Amino acid sequence: MKSALFTRFFILLPWILIVIIMLDVDTRRPVPPLTPRPYFSPYAVGRGGARLPLRRGGPAHGTQKRNQSRPQPQPEPQLPTIYAITPTYSRPVQKAELTRLANTFRQVAQLHWILVEDAAARSELVSRFLARAGLPSTHLHVPTPRRYKRPGLPRATEQRNAGLAWLRQRHQHQRAQPGVLFFADDDNTYSLELFQEMRTTRKVSVWPVGLVGGRRYERPLVENGKVVGWYTGWRADRPFAIDMAGFAVSLQVILSNPKAVFKRRGSQPGMQESDFLKQITTVEELEPKANNCTKVLVWHTRTEKVNLANEPKYHLDTVKIEV
C-alpha cells in the first residue's frame, strides 16, 4: 500500500513543482500603470473613414486635444468668374459657330456665358442650343436698328451694350464678387490658356490676336512690362489699336463706370474698341498678358462663307433637320 502511494507521489511531484515555479514568476512581474486607453467608437469616423478615439476623460477633453494638435484649414480664395459676352445673329453657320465656342467654354471653370441675339425675340434654335449646352448662361436679345445695318458701320453695338447692362443690373444691389469680362465673338477660336491669363486681370488686360487686320497677328508692343505702342495693319494711331478679342476688363471696373458703353453717334468704323476703352482706362494702365504679348492665344478664324447654290427654294426633304 505504501509503495503505491510513494509511486503516485513521485509521479505528481514534477507537476507540482512546475506549478509552484510558474506562480512564483508571475507574482514577481511589475504591475503596469493604470493609464486610460483610447476607446474606439464605431460611430466616430474621421477623415478617410478612419475611426477616431474617444477619450475616457469626456468628449470636451478629447475635442480640445484634437483642436490643439491640428490647425483649422483656411478657406480657399474664390475663383473670379469670367463673363463672356457673345453677340450672335441668324445665319447658316450660327449653330456651328456656337457649338465650337460652347465646347471651349465648357472646359473653363467658373465661366458665365451671356449670349445676345440680334433679334426682336429669342429664337428657338439658340434657346434649344443653350438648354443643351451644359453651361451657366444668360440668353438676351436686342435688334440692331435698320439704319445701322449698312455696310461699313460698326456691328454688334446694341448686343454688347445689352450684355453690359445685364451685368450692371445683376450686381446693382449686391456686393460684386471677383470677376472678369471679355467680348467673345462667335467667329473666334480660343486657347484654354487665355482664360488662365485673363482671370488675374486687375483692371484692363491685353494680348495679341491672330489672323486679324490683314496680318497674321496684331499685338500690343511692350517694354519693361508696359504697353508702349501697337503692331497693327490698320491705323496704328488709334488710342487703342486693338481688336475686340484682344482685351478683358475687371468686373469692378465695369461697375465703377456705369456710363461706359459702346457708342453709335460719333464713332467711326474700327474705333469701337478705342471709344470704349478710353472711358475706363489709359494705355499706361494696361496689363500685358500672354508672355508680354508675345503669344497668340485667340484667332479671328471666321467660318468660310457657305456655298448653298444647290439648296432647293422650297423644302423637299421628308424630315425637317436643324443645322
From Swiss-Prot:
Region annotation Disordered: where it falls in the sequence: 51-80
Its EC number is 2.4.1.135
- Which reaction equations make up its catalytic activity? 3-O-(beta-D-galactosyl-(1->3)-beta-D-galactosyl-(1->4)-beta-D-xylosyl)-L-seryl-[protein] + UDP-alpha-D-glucuronate = 3-O-(beta-D-GlcA-(1->3)-beta-D-Gal-(1->3)-beta-D-Gal-(1->4)-beta-D-Xyl)-L-seryl-[protein] + UDP + H(+)
Organism per entry:
Homo sapiens
UniProt: Mn(2+) binding residues: 187
- Site annotation Interaction with galactose moiety of substrate glycoprotein: residues: 218, 310
Q: Name one Pfam family in it.
A: Glyco_transf_43
Its needed co-factors are: Mn(2+)
Task: Provide the membrane-side ranges marked Cytoplasmic in the record.
Answer: 1-2
- Chain intervals for the UniProt region annotation (Interaction with galactose moiety of substrate glycoprotein): 234-243
Does the keyword Transmembrane belong to this entry? Answer: yes
Please report the name of this protein according to its UniProt entry: Galactosylgalactosylxylosylprotein 3-beta-glucuronosyltransferase 2
Q: Where does UDP-alpha-D-glucuronate bind?
A: 87-89, 118, 155, 160, 185-187, 300-302
Q: Which residues are glycosylated?
A: 67, 292
Active-site residues annotated for this sequence: 273
